[in-house]
A protein has these predicted regions:
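C-terminal, beta-rich DNA-binding module of retroviral/retroelements integrases
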Residues: 38, 186-299
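Mobile-element integrase/transposase regions
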Residues: 1-55, 66, 83
Length: 299
């Protein structure tokens, strides 16, 4: 039904040209898609080698078409968080606007709060409306110009119409042993990203590469960040509160238990804080990639 919906929109819905920004970091796009490269994996149930693919979430600068950050895996809040975190930690800039679709984890309160922190304006597009997101157009060209050269290229997604967008599946299935492992395939993809970023931008009259365009220019609407500001951006505030107990501050996330005590300047347990706050509930601010410490926030 989804592909029929796409075809209907392409045929009958009015099309609006997207006016792209003239400067990098004015607008970032984020989207999840199938990573169109096969890798070999062992099927334990059927005791045989099989060809598989995975998904990737990419963040792209709309002006330069520079790929800024990625995360391997299905589109959800975790992959969104990891990809945008990579983009901001690498380039240390807060874009003016971010556009995503309405799929994945964007509707979760924690996701909405996260996107509100990392840009000045966050918008979503309609699902399955390819023309509304320039990243899908760029990713199509990325596949055609770079990824298709690899022997384990799967062909583009089912909505692609060009014959060159598809590959001989039978040939690949007969040669599964020649496919790369998952880690080797990920390295292939990262090399493809590097090639794309170092290619000339299609609208540059001087042959400026995407990387050169992105690193040379910058939008006055974007905000430069230092190391501390970047770290603070990625701390999340827990949705639920936790009661401080005799054992300290104890909670579970993703089926893993975490225990914390509050210490004074000498490195000893702060008994004054401990005695005063047993039974008091706090929300906590945490870094999902560094759980060595958390901040307690009064409810």
């Amino acid at each position: 039904m989804v592909h029929g919906e796409i075809a209907f929109k392409n045929e009958f819905m009015p099309q609006f040209d997207t006016k792209l920004p003239q400067m990098p970091n004015t607008l970032w796009y984020g989207d999840g898609t199938k990573l169109n490269l096969y890798y070999k994996d062992y099927d334990k149930k059927n005791k045989r080698m099989v060809a598989r693919t995975i998904d990737v979430y990419e963040v792209m600068d709309a002006c330069s078409e520079m790929f800024l950050g990625y995360s391997f895996g299905a589109e959800n809040f975790l992959t969104q968080y990891e990809a945008y975190r990579m983009a901001l930690e690498t380039w240390k800039v807060k874009p003016y606007e971010i556009v995503t679709d309405n799929q994945g984890g964007h509707k979760k309160p924690e996701a909405q709060a996260f996107f509100k922190k990392i840009c000045h304006l966050h918008k979503t597009t309609m699902p399955h409306n390819g023309q509304s997101k320039t990243i899908e157009s760029a990713f199509g060209r990325f596949q055609q110009q770079v990824m298709h050269k690899l022997y384990n290229y799967t062909g583009q997604n089912v909505t692609a119409t060009k014959e060159s967008s598809h590959v001989n599946i039978d040939l690949i299935m007969k040669n599964i042993s020649q496919l790369p492992t998952l880690e080797e395939m990920k390295e292939q993809y990262l090399e493809c990203r590097r090639e794309w970023n170092s290619m000339p931008h299609p609208t540059s009259e001087t042959g400026m590469t995407r990387m050169e365009m992105y690193t040379t220019l910058n939008s006055p609407k974007a905000e430069q960040l230092d190391e501390y500001e970047v770290r603070e951006l990625f701390k999340l505030l827990s949705k639920d509160s936790v009661k401080y107990g005799k054992q300290g501050f104890v909670f579970s996330r993703n089926n893993k238990e975490y225990r914390y005590m509050v210490y004074d300047e000498s490195g000893q347990v702060d008994m004054g804080f401990h005695m005063q706050n047993v039974g008091v509930s706090f929300r906590y601010k945490y870094d999902p990639m560094d759980m060595t410490s958390v901040e307690l926030w009064e409810v």
